[in-house]
Design a protein with these regions (language model features):
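Short, low-complexity, intrinsically disordered N-terminal peptides in bacterial proteins
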Residues: 1-19, 150, 157, 162-163, ...
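N-terminal subdomain of lithium-sensitive/metallo-dependent phosphomonoesterases centered on the IMPase/IPPase/PAP
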Residues: 1-97
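Residue-level signal for inorganic ion chemistry
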Residues: 32, 56, 67, 100, ...
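Short acidic/glycine-enriched loop/turn segments that link adjacent beta-strands
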Residues: 48, 132, 250-252
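Acidic active-site catalytic centers that drive phospho-/nucleotidyl reactions
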Residues: 56, 79, 95-98, 102, ...
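DPxDG-like acidic metal-binding loop motif
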Residues: 86-147, 171
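Short helix-loop capping/hinge motifs at secondary-structure junctions, enriched
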Residues: 143-146, 150-152, 262-265
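An extended, acidic
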Residues: 157-277
Length: 277
C-alpha cells in the first residue's frame, strides 16, 4: 500500500498477535520517520506541547487498515480518532507516534506503540523507537524482550530489583507546567518526585516504560494517562517481572510502574499528597 509518497508493507494475517504487533509498530514508526524526513507541519491540540502531524494520522491509518484486514473481528482504538467496535471481545489500542513534540523537533525520543486488551486486562504490548532501533515486546504468556533478547532485570534471584527502594532509583515522569499551579495535582506529584533519587522528564511515556522494563530507568509515574499511553508499557513492564499500579488522589488517576517496592512507595508518596478529608 502507498500513503502519500511513502510505501508501507501489507502484513500477513497468518502472523500471530505478537508478530503482528511487532510488525505494526515497526512499519508505523518507519513510515512516520520517512514522512518527517520529507518535511512536516503540525497542528496544536490541547496545548503548545500537545500537537499532531500528518505522520501521526498516516501511521494510524496504516495500522487501522492492516488490523481491519488481519484481525477483522477485533476492535480498534487510536489516539488520533480510530474507533472500531469489534465482535471478538478484544481491542487493539494504537499510539502511532508517542512523543510527537519530540518527534517534530528532531529528537530520537519518540516511538510507535500498540497494545491488545480484552475485557479483563491488557494482553500484550509492543513499542518501537525507530531512530534507536529498539523494539520492546511482551505480555501474557510472552516474557518481555528488547530486540528479541529476554529482559531479566526484575528476575535476579527472585527479583532483587523488586526490593529496591524508590529513593535509590531515578524516576521518569511527566507533568504539564500548568498542572503545577493546581495543588490537587502538584502536591501528590511533588511528594512522589522528591522521594526519588533523580528525575527524568523525557517526553514519551511508552519510551520511558520500555526503559523501566529493561532497567535503564528505575520507575515511572504520571497522572491521567489515556490507554494508548499506558497499556503498551504496562504489558511489557509486567512481562519483564515488574509491577504496575494505579491510585486516585484528589480526583486524579495516577499510574505507576517499576519494581514492587518502588511502586508501593510511589503509591504511598502520591497518597500523602491528598488534600481531601
Amino acid at each position: 500500500m502507498t500513503i502519500g509518497r511513502h510505501s508501507a508493507v501489507e502484513l500477513d494475517p497468518a502472523l500471530d498477535d505478537y508478530q503482528l504487533a511487532s510488525a505494526l509498530v515497526r512499519e508505523a514508526g518507519q513510515l512516520a520517520l520517512l514522512m518527517r524526513m520529507a518535511g512536516l507541519q503540525s497542528q496544536q491540540k490541547t496545548s503548545v506541547s500537545d500537537i499532531v502531524t500528518a505522520a501521526d494520522h498516516a501511521a494510524e491509518a496504516y495500522v487501522l487498515e492492516q488490523l481491519q484486514r488481519c484481525r477483522p473481528e477485533d476492535g480498534i482504538l487510536g489516539e488520533e480518532g480510530a474507533s472500531v467496535q469489534g465482535s471478538s471481545g478484544r481491542t487493539w489500542v494504537i499510539d502511532p507516534v508517542d512523543g510527537t513534540y519530540n518527534f517534530l523537533h528532531g529528537s530520537t525520543y519518540w516511538c510507535s506503540a500498540i497494545a491488545l486488551k480484552d475485557s479483563s486486562d491488557v494482553l500484550l504490548g509492543a513499542i518501537f523507537q525507530p531512530e534507536e532501533d529498539k523494539l520492546w515486546l511482551g505480555g501474557g504468556s510472552r516474557p518481555a524482550t528488547l530486540n528479541g533478547q529476554a529482559l531479566a532485570v526484575f528476575h535476579d534471584n527472585g527479583g532483587a530489583r523488586n526490593s529496591t527502594a524508590v529513593a535509590e532509583f531515578g524516576a521518569a515522569t511527566y507533568i504539564h507546567p500548568s498542572w503545577l499551579a493546581d495543588p490537587l495535582c502538584a502536591m501528590p506529584w511533588h511528594a512522589a518526585a522528591t522521594s526519588a533519587a533523580a528525575l527524568r522528564m523525557l517526553g514519551s511515556g511508552s519510551c520511558d516504560l520500555g526503559r523501566v522494563a529493561d532497567g535503564q530507568l528505575g520507575c515511572w509515574f504520571q497522572h491521567s494517562c489515556p490507554e494508548w499511553d499506558w497499556l503498551p508499557g504496562k504489558a511489557i513492564v509486567r512481562a519483564a517481572g515488574g509491577a504496575t499500579d494505579t491510585v486516585r488522589v484528589n480526583g486524579l488517576e495516577w499510574f505507576m510502574a517499576g519494581g514492587t517496592t518502588a511502586v508501593r512507595e510511589l503509591r504511598a508518596a502520591l497518597e500523602s499528597g491528598s488534600v481531601t478529608t
